[in-house]
Amino acid sequence: MSEGTYQRLWEASHVTLEEVLEKEPSVLEPVPSRERQSFQYRISVLYLYYLGLLRRFNLAYDQMVQPQKRRLLRRLLDGVAGRVLELKDELVRVDLCETHCLDRVLQDLKLTPADLEVPIPKYFQLEQSSAVKARQQMLADILNRLEPLVSQENLRGLSRTAALILVQSAERARQGRLRATFMREIRKEEERDRRIWENGQQKFSRDQGAIVIQKVWKGYLQRKRIEQDRRVEMEFIGMLPSPNQTARLNTLNQAFLGEESRRMRQVEKEEEFQEAIGKTYESLTETEGPDMKERMKDQIRQWFIECHALTGRFPDYPDEASGGSYLIFADKTPEQVRLDLEAQAQESRKKDQEKKEKNKEKEKEKKEKKKKKVKEEKVKKEPEVMFRVLPSKSIPVINAGHEEYTSVWKSRYDNKHPSQNFDSETLREEKRKQVEMEIRVQVDELMRQELKNLRLAVDREETRPLKSPKKKGGKKSGKKKKEKDLTPDRSVDSLFEELVIIGLIKKSALVTLSDYIGDCLYLGSTLTLANKMPMPSLFDIRQNMALYGVLRLGSHDIHTMAPLVRSILLVGPSGMGKKMLVQAVCTETGANLFDLSPDNLMGKYPGKNGAQLLVHIVFKVARLLQPSVIWIGNTEKTFYKKVPKEERTMDPKRIKKDLMRATKQLSPGDRVMLIGTTERPQLAEMKGLCRFYERILFIPRPDYASRYVLWKRMIESQGRGVQLTSSLDVSALARVSDGYTPSHILQSIQSVLTERRLLQLIKKPLVASEFVGHLARLDPVYREEEESLKEWFFKTPLGKKNMKFTKDQLEAEEARLTKEKKKKK
């Protein structure tokens, strides 16, 4: 696409953004609980709108070349991402589950399921800081040093005679197979001639034979033409894959090259812009700086004289903390200055009156407290009936960005800057403000001394110490106790290397979140209306990991604006891709991977003090080298109800207390995420596990839609020449594989598609029966195991709330039906 295309995309996005911002106030109004569905619908609409804006801003920021526009786009992109995370939090609070059925909203907005995909900003990987890249290189160097030299085993060689015998036997076997095939064909030919002779079949004349051949050939040719036309039509409407991918690949390659060339231009324009920033700053300081300095001095001297004429004394010069002379001369006249001074005098009088009023207020407060107690007792008796949206940190950022676009960029046309160069006028205005602020600080220091000299010379008065403004009384901000540094004399690099050598920091596999294959839930609203809690699909799990893990860890600004989530628990049977999701989060964000699994901690940092030191070092390095992911595999062992005898020597619970204490210290801006995975959560203490993990994601067996996509995508990913044909019934495979995990499906595909089978695909297409035998040898996830996990999940805090809400709905529905029956009678 051209530069103009991305400019139009940006303009259209702001039109949509303006409409969405107009809808925001309506969501802030409290809604009674009986209107839960309408409230959820409004939040869902906003959520989908912001998802679309996030997708557009991500594309525009990735391909926009003009450096000043990119800075504004970055702020808008982070703000919209923060708002998406806030609305996700609201949806969880309203739906009482992590899976949201938005199919009805999609239909009303005329969107497709693809619009539910959470876009991951490309700058997370493309604009990784030099520190992150240096850390990854350091990890690779340490691991290379630790890798033992692979000893080449001396394979026992064959003697010349044994080798000849082996080759001869293989060649004789090959010749025997060919001879047997040849003889089989000869016998078939003889058998056919014998049957013709026995049946007495008469020979055709030359004309009759020609007619028969023509009839057969024309029928065959017409069938081939019809089949070809049908295939072309099915390929055109997207029902069949196109066998010729050359044109499509060429188009994709051209688009990729265009994107890369624009990114190269971004780097060039950014370097030019940075160079221009320095030159503009120096130019303004040299040319306009002296005039600014003299003008400010004249203004401040005039203020001294006018204040002395009005009040009979020189004013107190404001200190730097309150803004210095900037606030005084922010478009103020001497008369306004006089009014400000009178206002200060009135404030002192008000203080006396306030003391008298305080006594009256105390009496009123006592009465109000009594009223509040009565109200609280009523509220306790009555359930909460109102839904409210929590205040947003992202909306002010989005509003500021939209206002800047409207005032600066909306009315400007690209024909002024066809080469996407920076706007020098806008740059000079920004730098002029910076130079003015720096010069004002210098002028304030000089004028304070001049004011001191004036007081001594005119009023014979020494400078009065200016009282610093008192802080308003109120509750003291709760200060967290600073954690004692147990390694003050150690550098971060040495601690990092120590953790790598011990095996607590590991290199993550290069897996993207899009590699976690799955399709969305299409009948969620139908299940919800039937008062059935829909189980999440693999698509929902992927989206939740993008929201809770990737978006928060990818950007410091997004993490600061979004609701704080410190830890995630992934619960599901073996083979569902829990570890793959952890590695995908690390890949998408460039995060460090710390492995605190109980099996990995065995024998490392023994003792109570050792466990404390271990957790301290891990969290210290994780905070200093953000972003970081702390993975706890088999996390049920850390929270065991009762440690099994065979695992007592491992002492899996030894870091539990220190881990919980360190996790509570994480605050907004600390891009550290704890992710636990477990297959047997029933063995863990429920309260401790749910208190530690703030978000619990249950991963059930894949449904039919996800299995269909899994079979299709995994088969196609086995090689460039692998294509699905009509001979392979993917739908049948998806039905047969009910109960099997993605790992089972991948194992069966890899067992069938060997190198030899891949070479035979041209002559012998794949059929479903080839996979069924390999799949049958694997043990599926039995329904009893999944039901056990579901029962555990419904005992979690969110699961209990959902079950209670569903029960209340069923009771209300039964009561309504009984009333209707009575009325009919």
From Swiss-Prot:
Sample GO molecular function, one term: ATP binding
Residue ranges of the region described as Disordered: 344-378, 459-487
Coiled coil: none
Segments of skewed composition (Basic residues): 467-482
Assigned keywords, A-Z: ATP-binding, Nucleotide-binding
Key word Nucleotidyltransferase present: no
Keyword ATP-binding: yes
Sequence ranges of Basic and acidic residues compositional bias: 344-366
Protein name: IQ and AAA domain-containing protein 1-like
Family label: Belongs to the AAA ATPase family.
Alphabetized SUPFAM superfamilies for the sequence: P-loop containing nucleoside triphosphate hydrolases
Annotated signal peptide: none
InterPro entries (alphabetical): ATPase_AAA_core (IPR003959), IQ_motif_EF-hand-BS (IPR000048), N-DRC_Component (IPR052267), P-loop_NTPase (IPR027417)
Domain IQ, chain residue ranges per copy: 206-235
Binding site for ATP: 572-579
Top-rank taxon, per record: Eukaryota
